[in-house]
Amino acid sequence: MIEIKNLKFKYNQDQTSYTLNDVSFHVKHGEWLSIVGHNGSGKSTTARLIGGLLVADSGQIIVDGQELTEETVWDIRDKIGMVFQNPDNQFVGATVEDDVAFGLENKGLPYKEMVSRVQEALSFVGMMDFKDREPARLSGGQKQRVAIAGIIAMRPSILILDEATSMLDPEGRQELIQYIEDIRQQYGMTVLSITHDLDEVAMSNRVLVLKQGKVESISSPRELFSRGSELVDLGLDIPFSALLTQKLKNQGLIDCEGYLTEKELVEQLWEYLSKM
């Protein structure tokens, strides 16, 4: 679905090093790939290059078999929906309903189909009761849900999230992550998320780590979380379940190898307690 080959980019020619330096990776159709790393590692730059908002110095970006060029950029943008950290910058409609319908109006969809898509999208993210509200009067989590509804209505094949959950409280963050997974499952969207959030990373199929503009590793979330204290050097926290698992192992209370999810850790503890 997305193939990146030997991508190089710098914001100005005075930079002594590239923001992205020979980056290559791929994202399969229907996959959720998270990109993580320290601030300045090139995560958001990668998202903007794929979305055609920036132009690479060299390398190739291929989306759905089509190489991104000046001639194809608008075709490729039609296949991609992007949600940023601050959704206020994306709102254009006077009401929630108007905002979700905006992109469909620009595409010239028949009125009945447009109404149907808007209602379906708002219902999917639980915002139908807010359709007549001004977007500015919504909470942060509600604003992000409206932004995602606008993308659902457009039916792109790729959803790019650029720190979309970073401004939300823990409950709102968890709700949004679940909505994204539901969208991926129901609509078959490919998801690319730029994030520091461990819950978001845990939901993904694979995780790409960028370090100083280069690909440091590509692995499953489980493999990444098993790296323990190395995660701090990569701009991530150590998952609570990993810290607790290590302490329990040190005390001889559980016997396991590698990272355990919270669910797996609970199962291990129940097994231990049942033997007491």
Swiss-Prot record:
Record CDD domains: ABC_cobalt_CbiO_domain1 (cd03225)
Group of enzyme by EC: translocase
Q: Name one GO cellular component term.
A: ATP-binding cassette (ABC) transporter complex
Query: According to its UniProt record, which residues of this chain constitute the active site?
Result: E163 (proton acceptor)
Q: Domain (ABC transporter): give its ranges.
A: 2-237
Subunit structure, interactors included: Forms a stable energy-coupling factor (ECF) transporter complex composed of 2 membrane-embedded substrate-binding proteins (S component), 2 ATP-binding proteins (A component) and 2 transmembrane proteins (T component) upon coexpression of the components in E.coli. May be able to interact with more than 1 S component at a time.
Describe the task this protein carries out: ATP-binding (A) component of a common energy-coupling factor (ECF) ABC-transporter complex. Unlike classic ABC transporters this ECF transporter provides the energy necessary to transport a number of different substrates. Expression of the complex plus RibU in de-energized E.coli allows riboflavin uptake.
Q: What is this protein called?
A: Energy-coupling factor transporter ATP-binding protein EcfA1
Question: Whose protein is this, by species?
Answer: Streptococcus thermophilus (strain ATCC BAA-250 / LMG 18311)
Q: What is the lineage of its organism?
A: Bacteria, Bacillati, Bacillota, Bacilli, Lactobacillales
Recorded name of the encoding gene = ecfA1
